Amino acid sequence: MKPKLMYQELKVPAEEPANELPMNEIEAWKAAEKKARWVLLVLILAVVGFGALMTQLFLWEYGDLHLFGPNQRPAPCYDPCEAVLVESIPEGLDFPNASTGNPSTSQAWLGLLAGAHSSLDIASFYWTLTNNDTHTQEPSAQQGEEVLRQLQTLAPKGVNVRIAVSKPNGPQPQTDLQALLQSGAQVRMVDMQKLTHGVLHTKFWVVDQTHFYLGSANMDWRSLTQVKELGVVMYNCSCLARDLTKIFEAYWFLGQAGSSIPSTWPRFYDTRYNQETPMEICLNGTPALAYLASAPPPLCPSGRTPDLKALLNVVDNARSFIYIAVMNYLPTLEFSHPHRFWPAIDDGLRRAAYERGVKVRLLVSCWRHSESSMRAFLLSLAALRDNHTHSDIQVKLFVVPADEAQARIPYARVNHNKYMVTERATYIGTSNWSGNYFTETAGTSLLVMQNGRGSLRSQLEAIFLRDWDSPYSHDLDASADSVGNACRLL
């Protein structure tokens, strides 16, 4: 039997009067909440719209991103990058009808030095900015001597100057480097012969990790007045400049005593920017994609595209034309013993012309030091052009003329360019086009994909056509008398 329960009604506490908001404040709060929602919605739509606009711009510019790999999205950079092509035109070499007028290499270098505030990193092959190596008083050496003088002023002003240079395999003047050491610069010699059986053939500057020069010019007074050179200066482009600094840091590491190439490079040297995920930049006010490649493959940390792979990718994706200006072109490992055939680039050019109908123009330098075997390979490539194959390949030799005094200057009067341009891409490198430069020798290249009038690509195309159509370009069957003894291949 259940016990009898006593129920008692609980008393509920009386409610305190609520602090009610006046109706006008409630309405104001609701209005503010509604406005905030609309602002948030507008911001979301703006972000989505901007992304769609940029995607549309790049699709409009490039059609698709097949050139860089499937389904890859470029990593963005918001620097207002400015690119300027710079040239060294040898004294006495005139282009009277040319519309191109680019700044000189010496002007660009002196401008970079004048603007350096915190750091300057230089990767270089050798140093002869004075003409001590010729034991002459050559007036055209003055520009190189001025560059050296300005370099010596930087370290005393607090600029951290670092120079990575290839360790010479034999006697070589070190006067310039000794002067820079005395001024406070740091110098490390990279023994590429020991590391990869090659040399450090790279030629670039990085200033304040914001601006840089990359091109064909050596730290040689002749590269400013007696040798034809081409490079690019990138201003206010810290994203690319910092990435180029990573390549320099690898050289700097290898310049330490007893160093060796790591089996796996530390993550410090890795990059996010490469052929598959190029950097999305605004270049000279228009959209562009860019990345830096490096050689040889053992010097490519995670993410870095090897130079040869980048070069071949540009060749393989050309659909209209391929214009190439290079000092040496040899489908061989010319510094290997015994010599070995190396057709990687040659096959790519033949395939482009034969399979896709791409117009190929190859402008190779000819001077007193040209490798004599090069002629046979150039004739073989040019022979592909006939009425049966409909392959449009042409090869010319560029000869820099020299008067009696200029002819006495050693290792001068040559077209030292190392670039390629297609209807889609620009490739500016530091290597000659033969096998060892990509398998053993250290080099760097800048690749830019940009269309439109006034683009870097269109400017480089104009320079190539100026040279190709100039009186300094000669067919392979030209008479040797037309160039005197300045060309070994005729």
From Swiss-Prot:
<feature type="topological domain" description="Lumenal">
    <location>
        <begin position="60"/>
        <end position="490"/>
    </location>
</feature>
<keyword id="KW-0378">Hydrolase</keyword>
<feature type="glycosylation site" description="N-linked (GlcNAc...) asparagine">
    <location>
        <position position="236"/>
    </location>
</feature>
<dbReference type="InterPro" id="IPR001736">
    <property type="entry name" value="PLipase_D/transphosphatidylase"/>
</dbReference>
<dbReference type="GO" id="GO:0005789">
    <property type="term" value="C:endoplasmic reticulum membrane"/>
</dbReference>
<dbReference type="InterPro" id="IPR032803">
    <property type="entry name" value="PLDc_3"/>
</dbReference>
<keyword id="KW-0735">Signal-anchor</keyword>
<comment type="subunit">
    <text>Homodimer. Interacts with APP.</text>
</comment>
<feature type="disulfide bond">
    <location>
        <begin position="77"/>
        <end position="239"/>
    </location>
</feature>
<dbReference type="GO" id="GO:0014902">
    <property type="term" value="P:myotube differentiation"/>
</dbReference>
<keyword id="KW-0479">Metal-binding</keyword>
<keyword id="KW-0812">Transmembrane</keyword>
<keyword id="KW-0269">Exonuclease</keyword>
<feature type="disulfide bond">
    <location>
        <begin position="366"/>
        <end position="487"/>
    </location>
</feature>
<keyword id="KW-0256">Endoplasmic reticulum</keyword>
<feature type="active site">
    <location>
        <position position="208"/>
    </location>
</feature>
<dbReference type="GO" id="GO:0002376">
    <property type="term" value="P:immune system process"/>
</dbReference>
<comment type="similarity">
    <text>Belongs to the phospholipase D family.</text>
</comment>
<feature type="glycosylation site" description="N-linked (GlcNAc...) asparagine">
    <location>
        <position position="284"/>
    </location>
</feature>
<dbReference type="GO" id="GO:0000139">
    <property type="term" value="C:Golgi membrane"/>
</dbReference>
<feature type="binding site">
    <location>
        <position position="201"/>
    </location>
    <ligand>
        <name>phosphate</name>
    </ligand>
</feature>
<keyword id="KW-0832">Ubl conjugation</keyword>
<feature type="site" description="Cleavage; by lysosomal cysteine proteases">
    <location>
        <begin position="71"/>
        <end position="72"/>
    </location>
</feature>
<comment type="function">
    <text>5'-&gt;3' exonuclease that hydrolyzes the phosphodiester bond of single-stranded DNA (ssDNA) and RNA molecules to form nucleoside 3'-monophosphates and 5'-end 5'-hydroxy deoxyribonucleotide/ribonucleotide fragments. Partially redundant with PLD4, can cleave all four nucleotides displaying higher efficiency for ssDNA and RNA fragments initiated with uridine and guanosine residues and lower efficiency for cytidine-initiated substrates.</text>
</comment>
<keyword id="KW-0391">Immunity</keyword>
<keyword id="KW-0333">Golgi apparatus</keyword>
<keyword id="KW-0460">Magnesium</keyword>
<feature type="glycosylation site" description="N-linked (GlcNAc...) asparagine">
    <location>
        <position position="387"/>
    </location>
</feature>
<feature type="transmembrane region" description="Helical; Signal-anchor for type II membrane protein">
    <location>
        <begin position="39"/>
        <end position="59"/>
    </location>
</feature>
<keyword id="KW-1133">Transmembrane helix</keyword>
<keyword id="KW-1208">Phospholipid metabolism</keyword>
<feature type="binding site">
    <location>
        <position position="438"/>
    </location>
    <ligand>
        <name>Mg(2+)</name>
    </ligand>
</feature>
<dbReference type="GO" id="GO:0006954">
    <property type="term" value="P:inflammatory response"/>
</dbReference>
<dbReference type="GO" id="GO:0006629">
    <property type="term" value="P:lipid metabolic process"/>
</dbReference>
<dbReference type="GO" id="GO:0031902">
    <property type="term" value="C:late endosome membrane"/>
</dbReference>
<dbReference type="Pfam" id="PF13918">
    <property type="entry name" value="PLDc_3"/>
</dbReference>
<keyword id="KW-0458">Lysosome</keyword>
<keyword id="KW-0395">Inflammatory response</keyword>
<keyword id="KW-0443">Lipid metabolism</keyword>
<feature type="binding site">
    <location>
        <position position="416"/>
    </location>
    <ligand>
        <name>phosphate</name>
    </ligand>
</feature>
<keyword id="KW-0677">Repeat</keyword>
<dbReference type="GO" id="GO:0046872">
    <property type="term" value="F:metal ion binding"/>
</dbReference>
